[in-house]
């Protein structure tokens, strides 16, 4: 197995350390993970086809950051194996072994019951607006977030003077340091319009953008009901990330 491939998969859910725990599901050479934040304000699904691991199983990865650090010890390619134990006539995968000629790593897995469950949205709403996302926007958003690191949210609103949409980092109802980024918005339903600002986590959105820059297909849609959906396709990857509306920064 190539280390670059495994790390690329991890990066798309680990999101700079925002998500530590996830269940990896291997099924017919496809790997999928569903995950959510502790406050349940963010969840996602990452799937990669043609992963190159044939055994169907589920692995509970409790400390993804630790696994990433362990992988740094190895070179560009390694063997990936499962270690199993039997108790009460039940076979369980308890750890994985990752090895090459230089070193061998044993990484302990967690029971699946201790990993936060992310089953998906119970009632996914219809989306009202679609925002154009490209690499230029990604670069600008990431730089803007770095310039205002204390800002926890970004806001989609319509500028009353220009009648055009903007994404604002640092938005507040009072005067504040903020960055306005003009965006192209299209309506997904007739006469869709946002009559008030709607905000989502800039912490997670920044990491989503950074982890998926250069993707072939990138869609960001927003529902008045307080949900945003970032849908990304790139080669063998399909990613879906959902954010719940948050309060704007004070």
Indicate where each model-derived feature is located:
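DNA polymerase processivity clamps
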Residues: 1-107, 127-250
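Short, well-ordered, aromatic-rich surface patches in folded extracellular/luminal domains
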Residues: 105-121
